[in-house]
A protein has these predicted regions:
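N-terminal export and membrane-targeting signals
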Residues: 1-7
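C-terminal region of N-terminal signal peptides and the immediate post-cleavage residues
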Residues: 12-43
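Functionally critical loop-and-helix segments that line ligand-binding/catalytic clefts
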Residues: 39-74, 201-265
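Substrate-binding cleft of extracellular glycoside hydrolase catalytic domains
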Residues: 48-182
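Short, solvent-exposed coil/turn elements at secondary-structure transition points
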Residues: 67, 115, 190-192, 239
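Glycine-rich, charge-decorated loop segments at or immediately adjacent to ligand/cofactor-binding or catalytic sites
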Residues: 126, 192-203
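Aromatic-lined carbohydrate-recognition surfaces of secreted/lumenal glycan-active proteins
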Residues: 177-195, 208
């Protein structure tokens, strides 16, 4: 994840917008009291996938990406989630192939891609472009067949439009991935999601980032909801030995639904 203004902490793979940042988006013209649709007209439909067969992936997993290039992947690990991009859309994590090879040795895995909105052009076309590019980068690294993709939605990414435009970009990305035959989830936090995407509630699985903290605090956040879903995965940033890493665990209510959150062996 990329660093931006104020105290945005970049630790581990996805990282976390640790400080409360003021929203850089607006939800429509000033003075209006109406509640506009959370998506622009013509936005694609995002489907809520049927449940996968019962599966579990107990224990702590890790997400890694370009910040961990050249470093040994964490073990033991219950599962691994690897970033395709190099901190921004339309860029490559140059260690993706090696890092995903690590994830394939684990009982479950997934990938994530960076989201943003440039503020110019068609939000739907822009979102679809980001997905097409990410899939091409995945294949260029010799990786294919990953069935679970997460959209990284953070204030540290570029958001140069309204919440309605932002949400439409995200809808286009999710729908494009679903058309490619994969399952989709949202990585964010309740605060960040509200500031970026407003009231849009697609009902996709969500991965809740609490930032620096403890496992106990992360598990306590499992009841939090955003984007129309209760937290399925939680992430906390902490030391593992001498290293600071993004730790992740499946929430208790989802303990037998690992297949809805990860690509389970």
């Amino acid at each position: 994840m990329i660093g931006v203004v104020l105290a945005l902490a970049v630790i581990g793979g996805l990282g976390y917008a640790g400080a409360r940042l003021l929203s850089r988006t607006s939800g429509g013209s000033g003075g209006t009291t109406s509640s506009p649709s959370p998506l622009l007209p013509g936005a694609p439909t995002v489907a809520v996938a049927p449940r996968e067969p019962a599966a579990s992936a107990p224990g702590v997993g890790y997400d890694i990406s370009y910040p961990q290039c050249g470093r040994t992947a964490p073990r033991p690990a219950a599962f691994g989630i690897v970033g395709v991009n190099g901190g921004a859309p339309l860029t490559s994590n140059k260690c993706f192939a090696a890092q995903f090879a690590w994830a394939r040795t684990l009982s479950a895995r997934a990938v994530y891609i960076t989201t943003s909105w440039s503020g110019t052009g068609d939000p739907v076309a822009y979102g679809e472009k980001l997905v097409t590019d990410a899939i091409e980068r995945e294949h260029a690294a010799g990786v294919s067949g990953v069935s679970m993709w997460w959209l990284d939605v953070e204030l540290g990414n570029t958001w140069n439009g309204t919440q309605q435009e932002n949400a439409t970009v995200l809808a286009a990305m999710a729908a494009k991935l679903q058309a490619a035959g994969v399952r989709v989830g949202i990585y964010s936090s309740p605060q960040q999601w509200a500031e970026i995407a407003g009231d849009w509630q697609p009902g996709l699985p969500v991965w809740n980032a609490i930032g620096p903290g403890t496992r106990a605090r992360a598990i306590a956040s499992c009841g939090e909801e955003f984007a129309g879903s209760t937290s399925g995965l939680v992430q906390w940033v902490a030391k593992k030995g001498a290293r600071v890493l993004d730790h992740n665990e499946i929430c208790p209510a989802w303990k037998n639904r690992a297949g809805d959150l990860l690509d389970v062996s």
